[in-house]
Swiss-Prot record:
EC numbers on record: 6.1.1.19
InterPro entries: aa-tRNA-synth_I_CS, Arg-tRNA-ligase, Arg-tRNA-synth_N, Arg-tRNA-synth_N_sf, ArgRS_core, DALR_anticod-bd, Rossmann-like_a/b/a_fold, tRNAsynth_Ia_anticodon-bd
Disulfide bonds listed in the record: none
Membrane is among the record's keywords: no
Annotated localization: Cytoplasm
UniProt-recorded name of the protein: Arginine--tRNA ligase
Organism: Helicobacter pylori (strain P12)
Length: 541
């Protein structure tokens, strides 16, 4: 609808037109500030230009039946859509059903490679991982809904010092808790009950003879064993959030291409040796300094592995590559982009979204850390506490790059302070009305909208505005817009519902048709957020 109006106005005015929502609903459904943009060109006051353009638009043949009014106001041009247009758009939307909102031209479709979570398989997923996980999953849902092709990948760091440290930690726990030996732990090791669990499970699963090998062999065996167990648990944690990946890429497998990649970097004059280390000339591409790829002991840095991985990704020729990283990886972006340029790739195809920190409270106190994982809050614990849908909604309710703090008890309340409950409640009210109604759904769907007041028209307009919310959420990577849209629409519906009886009016079928439209938009919005909307709310909800 937004796109259609914009297209009509641009055709009439032969200028690019920005369409906005007026701050005051009494000013109409849409507004444009185009008169301000043209003031310098025509050397006239925006007020005069707005008046002239409003007259031109309102009398043009292409707008007949489209607007009830086109009014100039303080330099803006405000538009109120006609009921006839809203009715036609409503009928089309209700016919589209679950596809309503997915309106994109095929020539704009993209191939998107989306990598997110990619947490080291050295421990359970904690709440910090969940924010990026939920965001990435919903971004993929929205992108696919808009007709884009998306591959979701989890990059598994299954080699290197962290994996060896995992094996060492399990081996020491095995000696202490299975063999009952006195053990001296190093300054840095993986703590938590999960390490002890793995050690005890290894005692049951692995051949006793394996524990008679030399210590380095034992650590290597336990590293692989523990890594596999943690990856299974990570997948279970993601499943609890409703998240499934198309692909899991192994760093160990990807790193087999290291020599070929380094050879290309050398040919590109991207490397040099200094202090017995191999450096990348990343400072040539806006990095703060050059970066070490190979250390003095000939082992590779994490960056070396990431360079090989990104080269493998870019060989697949996607339109766009999106990484979702923790905010602490901000400085990492320039060095990865530098490597892509050296390897002959277009680094502008890579977009990195940074997820800020999450702080959970319960009864206004910091959420209790998990004994099992040490100093972390586990995803599973919070999902068990409040449910996946509530957790997904709250994680998506603020921009990814802003800090998020919330009290989980808010998500258990059954009032308007709990946004997800309030939205579920709106949909529940609609379905309860439909059940009580003497009219069939088919009767309601076939009823023409001919007698709506301004408030009813505005509620219908809000329900029909889902496509713009979907498009903006994707284009701006602002998934909070979907949450805001659903909250606002639910709030407008509750105001409409509380204003008076719906079923006991002569135009009950028309009002129920609006309700069906509201329900469809809320359902589709929630589906894109990875949430199943409720049609009934019981006392236990």
């Amino acid at each position: 609808m937004h796109t259609l109006i914009k297209g009509v106005l641009e055709e009439i005015l032969e200028e690019e037109v920005i369409i906005e929502y007026p701050k005051d609903r009494e000013h109409g459904h849409y507004a444009t500030p185009i008169a301000f943009n043209l003031a310098k060109v025509f050397k006239k006051s925006p007020l005069v230009i707005a008046e002239e353009l409003a007259l031109k638009i309102s009398t043009h043949e292409k707008t007949q039946g489209l607007f009830d009014s086109v009014v100039a106001c303080k330099g803006y041009i405000n538009f109120t859509l006609s009921l006839d247009f809203l009715e036609r758009f409503t009928q089309k939307a209700l016919e589209l059903k679950e596809r309503f909102g997915s309106q994109i031209k095929s020539e704009r479709s993209q191939k998107i490679f989306l990598e997110f979570v990619s947490a080291n398989p050295t421990g359970p997923l904690h709440i910090g991982h969940a924010r990026g996980a939920v965001f990435g999953d919903s971004l993929a849902k929205i992108a696919r809904f808009l007709g884009h092709e998306v591959l979701c990948e989890y990059y598994v760091n299954d080699m290197g010092s962290q994996i060896r440290l995992l094996g060492l930690s399990v081996w020491l726990a095995y000696r202490e808790h299975v063999l009952k030996e006195s053990v001296t732990y190093p300054e840095v090791f993986y703590k938590g009950e999960y390490i002890i669990e793995i050690a005890k499970k290894a005692n049951n699963d692995l051949e006793p003879s394996l524990f008679k090998e030399n210590e380095e062999t034992i650590i290597e065996i336990l590293s692989g064993y523990a890594k596999d167990l943690m990856l299974l648990e990570i997948k279970d944690n993601l499943d609890a959030l409703g998240i499934h990946f198309d692909s899991y890429a192994s760093e160990k497998e990807v790193f087999k291409h290291k020599d070929a990649v380094f050879e290309r970097l050398e040919k590109a004059n991207a490397l040099y040796e200094k202090d017995s280390k191999i450096w990348l000339k990343s400072s040539l591409y806006q990095d703060e300094s050059d970066r070490v790829l190979i250390k003095e002991d000939k082992s590779c840095t994490y960056l070396a592995g990431d360079i090989v991985y990104h080269d493998e990704k870019f060989k697949q020729n996607y339109t766009k590559y999106i990484n979702i990283w923790g905010a602490d990886h901000h400085g990492y972006i320039a060095r990865v982009k530098a490597s892509l340029e050296f390897l002959g790739h277009d680094s502008n195809k890579l977009e990195v979204l940074l997820a800020q920190m999450v702080r959970l409270l319960k009864d206004n106190e910091p959420y209790k850390m998990s004994k099992r994982a040490g100093n972390f809050i586990l995803i599973k614990d919070v999902v068990d506490d409040v449910g996946k849908d509530a957790l997904r909604f709250i994680f998506l309710s603020k921009r990814l790059d802003t800090h998020l703090e919330f009290d989980v008890n808010t998500l258990k309340k059954q009032d308007s302070s709990n946004p997800i409950y309030y939205i579920h409640y709106a949909n529940s009210r609609i379905h309860t009305m439909l059940e009580k109604s003497p009219f069939s759904k088919e009767e309601v769907l076939q009823t023409p909208l001919t007698n709506l007041n301004a408030e009813e028209k505005y509620l219908l307009f809000s329900a029909l505005s889902l496509p713009k919310a979907v498009e903006s959420s994707f284009e701006e990577y602002g998934l909070q817009k979907m949450c805001e849209y659903a909250k606002t629409l639910a709030s407008e519906f509750h105001r409409f519902y509380n204003a008076g009886k719906i079923l006991d009016t002569p135009k009950a079928k028309e009002l129920l048709k609006i309700c069906l439209m509201v329900s469809l938009s809320l359902t589709n919005a929630f589906k894109l957020l990875g949430i199943e909307i409720k049609t009934k709310i019981s006392a236990k909800d």
